[in-house]
């Protein structure tokens, strides 16, 4: 087993990463499965907030790591709900007692929005290669061998988490394995900000990616915001996302600190869709947020078909005009030249 497969990361030019297996039911990939914005114009009353959001651009992402899900500790603060995903477009229906990934909202969070926060390349960067200035060194046992994972904290992550914990019901949601991500979260979360921790088992495997399906959280979609460096993670719910730049080791990075004013304002609006919209409408139709994921993939195909039809119609029209022009008799063309100034096209015909 490749040790790096326990961490889900995006790639950069100088790093070689593994990719997901071609088939999610591969026994080597699923053995031990434990279960558990591009942001255009928004309403005028959110003009300043929209200005803060517009600078955020989704980053181009590489392929994710290969999977190997292993056991993890049974923690009361870690949510254990979930089910194995067979690679279809949507997760299978869950029994009533396992319907949602998150527990009931605490009284202290009753009037707060839910913030889903990614881990790798959003809050930290981890490597199996020794890093002299690592903030944490986490031992991880893989196939009977203990490996050291070197973890760097993103600049201003402490300030960011502390402030978000005061404003939101915060949930850690990562596509990495719990045996790595859980101890990292223990060291990172000094203030017990994360009300729950969700790992790779809670994701939906769809078209080679692990998707964080916000429908399964058990919270009002209009009151959920996801902070993630990978657009593939929130492909089902792009209107709920605030994309962040992938971070590896830049000590001058200020992304998290600069996002704090945005999230302070976002915590006060009635619906996140009024700001994090991907259309000119202030609030998208709720059914668009809950539509079958396959329809999200079909929409570009329908647009492509419409463009092809338009091109075919233009070709037919152009052919008709050319045919009509060639059927004109010579006297008719001479009469037209006498009654009207010669056109560039007629001059070219005369020269030929």
UniProtKB/Swiss-Prot annotation:
It is found in: Cell membrane. Disulfide bonds: none annotated. Residues 103-267 are annotated as: Mediates substrate recognition. Residues 108-266 form the FCP1 homology domain. One of its GO terms (cellular component) is plasma membrane. This is Phosphatase Herzog. It comes from the Eukaryota. Its EC number is 3.1.3.16. Residues 284-310, 332-352 are annotated as: Disordered. One of its GO terms (molecular function) is phosphoprotein phosphatase activity. Its main location: membrane. It is an enzyme of class 3 (hydrolase). It catalyses: O-phospho-L-seryl-[protein] + H2O = L-seryl-[protein] + phosphate. InterPro entries: Dullard_phosphatase (IPR011948), FCP1_dom (IPR004274), HAD-like_sf (IPR036412), HAD_sf (IPR023214), RNA_Pol_CTD_Phosphatase (IPR040078), TIM50 (IPR050365). Monomer. Forms higher-order protein aggregates with amyloid-like features during gastrulation. Interacts with babo, dah, Irk1, pch2, Ras64B, sax and Src64B. The keyword Membrane applies. GO terms for biological process: positive regulation of embryonic development. Prion-like membrane-associated phosphatase. Phosphatase activity depends on amyloid-like assembly at the membrane. Might have a role in establishment of segment polarity in embryos. It comes from Drosophila melanogaster (Fruit fly). NCBIfam families: HIF-SF_euk (TIGR02251).
């Amino acid at each position: 087993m490749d040790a790096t497969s326990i961490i889900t990361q995006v790639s950069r030019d100088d790093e070689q990463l593994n990719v997901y297996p071609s088939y999610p039911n591969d026994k080597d990939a699923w053995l031990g499965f434990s279960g558990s914005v591009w942001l255009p114009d928004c309403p005028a009353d959110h003009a300043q907030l929209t200005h803060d959001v517009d600078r955020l651009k989704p980053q181009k992402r590489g392929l994710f790591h290969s999977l190997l899900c292993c056991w993890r500790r049974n923690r009361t603060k870690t949510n254990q709900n979930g089910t194995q995903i067979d690679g279809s477009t949507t997760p299978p229906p869950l029994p009533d007692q396992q319907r949602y990934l998150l527990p009931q909202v605490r009284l202290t969070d009753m009037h707060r929005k839910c913030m889903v926060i990614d881990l790798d390349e959003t809050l930290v960067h981890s490597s199996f290669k020794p890093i002299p200035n690592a903030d944490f060194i986490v031992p991880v046992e893989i196939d009977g061998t203990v490996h050291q994972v070197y973890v760097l904290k993103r600049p201003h992550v402490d300030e960011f988490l502390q402030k978000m914990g005061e404003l939101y019901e915060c949930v850690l949601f990562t596509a990495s394995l719990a045996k790595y991500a859980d101890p990292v979260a223990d060291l990172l979360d000094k203030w017990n900000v994360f009300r729950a921790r969700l790992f790779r088992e809670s994701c939906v495997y769809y078209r080679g990616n692990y998707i964080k399906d916000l429908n399964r959280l058990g919270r009002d979609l209009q009151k959920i915001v996801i902070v993630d460096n990978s657009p593939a993670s929130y492909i089902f719910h792009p209107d709920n996302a605030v994309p962040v730049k992938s971070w590896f080791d830049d000590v001058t990075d200020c992304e998290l600190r600069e996002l704090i004013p945005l999230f302070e304002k976002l915590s006060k609006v009635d619906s996140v869709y009024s700001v994090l919209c991907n259309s000119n409408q202030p609030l998208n139709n709720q059914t668009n947020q809950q539509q079958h994921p396959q329809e999200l993939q079909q929409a570009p195909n329908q647009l492509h078909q419409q463009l092809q039809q338009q091109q075919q119609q233009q070709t037919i029209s152009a052919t008709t005009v050319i045919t009509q022009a060639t059927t004109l008799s010579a006297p008719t063309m001479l009469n037209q030249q006498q009654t009207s100034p010669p056109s560039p096209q007629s001059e070219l015909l005369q020269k030929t």
